[in-house]
Swiss-Prot record:
Cofactor binding: number and manner: Binds 1 Zn(2+) ion per subunit.
InterPro entries (UniProt xref): Anti-sigma-K/W_factor, Anti_sigma_zinc_sf, Znf_put
Primary residence: membrane
GO biological process, one term: regulation of translation
Organism: Geobacillus kaustophilus (strain HTA426)
Membrane disposition: Single-pass membrane protein
Name the UniProt record assigns to this protein: Anti-sigma-W factor RsiW
Gene3D superfamilies listed in its UniProt record: Anti-sigma factor, zinc-finger domain
Length: 203
């Protein structure tokens, strides 16, 4: 004989504590007459009692620490990979900076040909740019792989890369005079130049 499904639902309600008194009476009457349902009810009762007992069992205080010690240690490469995935913008900026600094440092080692940015009112002799006495050069002068001797006036900045500057007592420069002979000075100069060019293109 198959028991109706409502008896199983009554059992569940009983263990949940939601069973009304009339439902409890109906369940008890059925359990007296059906041995299979009584056995099932008894098994459920044992299971509920076991779960209630197990809920009060606590792990030893050092259990979590011992489990963490027993776990395999995380490799440094996994930690680095996780950091790179969590911070993509920082990773991209760092990579860009490293490549930029690397290219600037490598271009420092490549000593190119002599060049000068101004050719009016100057004399060029054996990789030396001379601003003659009584002459005024308007604008900035950049000398690469050579030297500059200022006897006149420069109305702007003077930058010497891989070279020397010589100032006569009568020579004047209205702007800054900068000698770049080290790699870090070269990198800083290029960063400033690129930044100034970017600002000029925005304007």
């Amino acid at each position: 004989m198959e028991c109706p499904k409502e008896i199983v639902l009554l059992m569940h309600s009983y263990f949940d504590g939601d069973l009304q008194p009339e439902g409890e009476q109906q369940l008890k009457e059925h359990l007296r007459s059906c041995a299979a349902c009584a056995a099932h009810f008894h098994e459920l009762k044992k299971t509920v009692a076991f779960l209630q007992y197990a809920a009060h069992v606590a792990a030893p205080p050092s259990f979590a620490a011992k489990v963490m010690e027993a776990m395999p240690k995380e490799r440094k490469t996994a930690r680095l990979r996780r950091f790179l995935h969590r911070h993509p913008l920082l990773t991209a900026a760092s990579l860009f900076l490293a490549l930029t600094l690397g290219s600037l440092a490598s271009s420092w080692g490549e000593r190119g040909a002599f060049s000068v940015s101004a050719d009016e009112h100057v004399i060029i002799r054996d990789h030396t740019v001379i601003v003659p006495k009584g002459e005024t050069v308007k604008g900035d002068i950049v000398v690469r792989n050579g030297s500059i001797r200022i006897e006149g006036t420069v109305d702007g900045d003077v930058t010497v890369i891989h070279g020397k500057k010589y100032m006569a007592s009568a020579g004047q420069v209205t702007g800054e005079v900068e000698e770049i002979n080290q790699v870090f000075e070269w990198i800083w100069y290029n960063i400033k130049e690129r930044f100034n060019r970017a600002l000029q293109s925005i304007e």
